[in-house]
């Protein structure tokens, strides 16, 4: 009997019945379905209700899982007050790239056709449209008889012939304090030689402002020098029909992209630009499409990633690949394009890339971005009351003041910034919470209930497998070993002397019954 019991123990204890498990389970309704009663209408109704609830639960959970894998996001908009804000970088360019007075005979010889001042035969194309004074100067410079051309460099030409901020800047104030041309850093763009205020480069700290409103930002008065504009006798990519400046307000962490993102400021007006800093936070895939910026910007010519840096980087690579040169405003160490390369290759290629090619330069949105919202308003200057005063102050005519002077006032509207943040509409915690809530509502289950079911299923499966297969053989082998051990123990525990001593007559044998034992003796004496 002991061997049989131990064999059953090795084979595995039989799990409790389904009725016993159901009666103690925390899963609602299970005890009513698997009860000890005979099959009845009550049990059938309970089973039907349980299966219906389970089906609804599966449908709801499936819908929640599908919704999660759509990776929806929502946008949170907030305004945060600040005690101070970093003033943005302000880049400005004169819409005229080259000053007429700075174009030399050598410049005209090499770049006259590019500037539409000369035709391909080095002749002035239409003398009837020229101003007499400009025509006389141009005819003298265009006389190339016995002229020996010198080496020409486009970068040097842009730098020398571009408008000088020291000549354009008539007045400058930041937060009521006087500033000067030294506070502007030269930067080259597609508009040529431009200037950036508060660039934050060359070891200069970024300027901050403590208040909002006019008078607490940058206010400058500029002379656009229309008398230095190149005469327009034809159309090229370098030709400008406008008069004024182009302005871009941007973060110090991104280069200016003024030909695409700038706004115009006209002479004869004071332009007010009320700004608000906007901090944008986008989500990376799969919730969004932004690019997570790392220490390595993945750009060839810029240390930090931004959309404008990516565009300039891409345009530079495109021109180097197609024209074997780069424009003056482009970074890198490739040679600068010659005027002929500008006209024949660089300008057409860049125009095609900007306007038509939507696949070559695909720049992803960075996940963190700072931009500046703007509201512009203008008033006419000079007034009739101030025209004579300004003409006398700057030693110009009233007509010149009206045609060339502009005032630009850039300030924060209020001292706060706006955050526009993308957030996950549905996270894993929400998914688990919804599934858990639906489980509790429809079948009264929790995670521990599911563990109960798995534990019971494991015990049943283990018992079935052990009865059919390997466990049974191992049980028999183990039982045999234990049986031998038990027999030896029984022998050791057995004491025959006690039973023999208790025999009333004892046991005696004849002397000859045992060899070499001459005397009679009892069996007790022999064995004990």
UniProtKB/Swiss-Prot annotation:
<protein>
    <recommendedName>
        <fullName>Acid-sensing ion channel 1</fullName>
    </recommendedName>
</protein>
<dbReference type="GO" id="GO:0015280">
    <property type="term" value="F:ligand-gated sodium channel activity"/>
</dbReference>
<dbReference type="GO" id="GO:0009986">
    <property type="term" value="C:cell surface"/>
</dbReference>
<feature type="disulfide bond">
    <location>
        <begin position="93"/>
        <end position="194"/>
    </location>
</feature>
<keyword id="KW-0597">Phosphoprotein</keyword>
<comment type="subunit">
    <text>Forms functional homotrimeric channels. Forms heterotrimers with other ASIC proteins, resulting in channels with distinct properties. Interacts with PICK1; regulates ASIC1 clustering in membranes. Interacts with STOM; alters heterotrimeric channels activity.</text>
</comment>
<dbReference type="GO" id="GO:0042391">
    <property type="term" value="P:regulation of membrane potential"/>
</dbReference>
<dbReference type="GO" id="GO:0010447">
    <property type="term" value="P:response to acidic pH"/>
</dbReference>
<dbReference type="GO" id="GO:0035725">
    <property type="term" value="P:sodium ion transmembrane transport"/>
</dbReference>
<dbReference type="GO" id="GO:0001662">
    <property type="term" value="P:behavioral fear response"/>
</dbReference>
<keyword id="KW-0628">Postsynaptic cell membrane</keyword>
<feature type="transmembrane region" description="Helical">
    <location>
        <begin position="50"/>
        <end position="66"/>
    </location>
</feature>
<dbReference type="GO" id="GO:0098793">
    <property type="term" value="C:presynapse"/>
</dbReference>
<keyword id="KW-1133">Transmembrane helix</keyword>
<dbReference type="GO" id="GO:0022839">
    <property type="term" value="F:monoatomic ion-gated channel activity"/>
</dbReference>
<dbReference type="GO" id="GO:0007613">
    <property type="term" value="P:memory"/>
</dbReference>
<dbReference type="GO" id="GO:0150052">
    <property type="term" value="P:regulation of postsynapse assembly"/>
</dbReference>
<feature type="short sequence motif" description="GAS motif; ion selectivity filter">
    <location>
        <begin position="444"/>
        <end position="446"/>
    </location>
</feature>
<feature type="disulfide bond">
    <location>
        <begin position="325"/>
        <end position="337"/>
    </location>
</feature>
<dbReference type="GO" id="GO:0050915">
    <property type="term" value="P:sensory perception of sour taste"/>
</dbReference>
<keyword id="KW-0894">Sodium channel</keyword>
<keyword id="KW-0812">Transmembrane</keyword>
<feature type="disulfide bond">
    <location>
        <begin position="323"/>
        <end position="345"/>
    </location>
</feature>
<dbReference type="GO" id="GO:0160128">
    <property type="term" value="F:pH-gated monoatomic ion channel activity"/>
</dbReference>
<dbReference type="GO" id="GO:0071467">
    <property type="term" value="P:cellular response to pH"/>
</dbReference>
<dbReference type="GO" id="GO:0005886">
    <property type="term" value="C:plasma membrane"/>
</dbReference>
<feature type="site" description="Involved in the inhibition by the spider venom psalmotoxin-1">
    <location>
        <position position="352"/>
    </location>
</feature>
<feature type="site" description="Involved in proton-dependent gating">
    <location>
        <position position="357"/>
    </location>
</feature>
<feature type="disulfide bond">
    <location>
        <begin position="310"/>
        <end position="363"/>
    </location>
</feature>
<dbReference type="Pfam" id="PF00858">
    <property type="entry name" value="ASC"/>
</dbReference>
<feature type="topological domain" description="Cytoplasmic">
    <location>
        <begin position="459"/>
        <end position="528"/>
    </location>
</feature>
<keyword id="KW-0813">Transport</keyword>
<dbReference type="GO" id="GO:0005794">
    <property type="term" value="C:Golgi apparatus"/>
</dbReference>
<feature type="disulfide bond">
    <location>
        <begin position="172"/>
        <end position="179"/>
    </location>
</feature>
<feature type="topological domain" description="Cytoplasmic">
    <location>
        <begin position="1"/>
        <end position="49"/>
    </location>
</feature>
<comment type="function">
    <text>Forms voltage-independent, pH-gated trimeric sodium channels that act as postsynaptic excitatory receptors in the nervous system, playing a crucial role in regulating synaptic plasticity, learning, and memory. Upon extracellular pH drop this channel elicits transient, fast activating, and completely desensitizing inward currents. Displays high selectivity for sodium ions but can also permit the permeation of other cations. Regulates more or less directly intracellular calcium concentration and CaMKII phosphorylation, and thereby the density of dendritic spines.</text>
</comment>
<dbReference type="GO" id="GO:0046929">
    <property type="term" value="P:negative regulation of neurotransmitter secretion"/>
</dbReference>
<comment type="similarity">
    <text>Belongs to the amiloride-sensitive sodium channel (TC 1.A.6) family. ASIC1 subfamily.</text>
</comment>
<keyword id="KW-0915">Sodium</keyword>
<dbReference type="GO" id="GO:0006814">
    <property type="term" value="P:sodium ion transport"/>
</dbReference>
<dbReference type="GO" id="GO:0001975">
    <property type="term" value="P:response to amphetamine"/>
</dbReference>
<dbReference type="InterPro" id="IPR001873">
    <property type="entry name" value="ENaC"/>
</dbReference>
């Amino acid at each position: 009997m002991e061997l049989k019991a131990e064999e059953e123990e090795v084979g595995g204890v039989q799990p409790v019945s389904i009725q016993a498990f159901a009666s103690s389970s925390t899963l609602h309704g299970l005890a009513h379905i698997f009860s000890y009663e005979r099959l009845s209408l009550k049990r059938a109704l309970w089973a039907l209700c349980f299966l219906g609830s389970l089906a609804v639960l599966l449908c709801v959970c499936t819908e929640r899982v599908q919704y999660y894998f759509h990776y929806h996001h929502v946008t949170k908009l907030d305004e945060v007050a600040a005690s101070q804000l970093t003033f943005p970088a302000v880049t400005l360019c004169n819409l005229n790239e080259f000053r007429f007075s700075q174009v030399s005979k050598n410049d005209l010889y090499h770049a006259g056709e590019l500037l539409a001042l000369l035709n391909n035969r080095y002749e002035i194309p239409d003398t009837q449209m020229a101003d007499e004074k400009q025509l006389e100067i141009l005819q003298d410079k265009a006389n190339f008889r016995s002229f020996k051309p010198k080496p020409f460099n486009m970068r040097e030409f842009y730098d020398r012939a571009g408008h000088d901020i020291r000549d354009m800047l008539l007045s400058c104030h930041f937060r009521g304090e006087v500033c000067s041309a030294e506070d502007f850093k030269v930067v080259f763009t597609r508009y040529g030689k431009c200037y950036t205020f508060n660039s934050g480069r060359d070891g200069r700290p970024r300027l901050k402002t403590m208040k909002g409103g006019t008078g607490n930002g940058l206010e400058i008065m500029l002379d656009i020098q229309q008398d230095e504009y190149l005469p327009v006798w034809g159309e090229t990519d370098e030709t400008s029909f406008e008069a004024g400046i182009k302005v871009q307000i941007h973060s110090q962490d991104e280069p200016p992209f003024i030909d695409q993102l700038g706004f115009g400021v006209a002479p004869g007006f004071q332009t007010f630009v009320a700004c608000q800093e906007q901090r944008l936070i986008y989500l990376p895939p799969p919730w969004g499409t932004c690019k997570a910026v790392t220490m390595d910007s993945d750009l060839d010519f810029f240390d930090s990633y931004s959309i404008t840096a990516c565009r300039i980087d891409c345009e530079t690579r495109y021109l180097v690949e197609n024209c074997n040169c780069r424009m003056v405003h482009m970074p890198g160490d490739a040679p600068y394009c010659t005027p002929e390369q500008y006209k024949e290759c660089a300008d057409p290629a860049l125009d095609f890339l900007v306007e038509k090619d939507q696949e070559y330069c695909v720049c992803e949105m960075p996940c963190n971005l700072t931009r500046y919202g703007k509201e512009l308003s203008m008033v006419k200057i000079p007034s009739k009351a101030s025209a004579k005063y300004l003409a006398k102050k700057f030693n110009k005519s009233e007509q010149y003041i009206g045609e060339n002077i502009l005032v630009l006032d850039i300030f924060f509207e209020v001292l706060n910034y706006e955050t526009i943040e993308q957030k996950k509409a549905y996270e894993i915690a929400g998914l688990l919470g919804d599934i858990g809530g639906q489980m509790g509502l429809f079948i009264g289950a929790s995670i521990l209930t599911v563990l109960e079911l798995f534990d019971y299923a494991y015990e049943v499966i283990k018992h079935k497998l052990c009865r059919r297969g390997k466990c049974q053989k191992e049980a028999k082998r183990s039982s045999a070993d234990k049986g031998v051990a038990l027999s030896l123990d029984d022998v050791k525990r057995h004491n025959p002397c006690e039973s023999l001593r208790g025999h009333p007559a004892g046991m005696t044998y004849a002397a000859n019954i045992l060899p070499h034992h001459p005397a009679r003796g009892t069996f007790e004496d022999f064995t004990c």
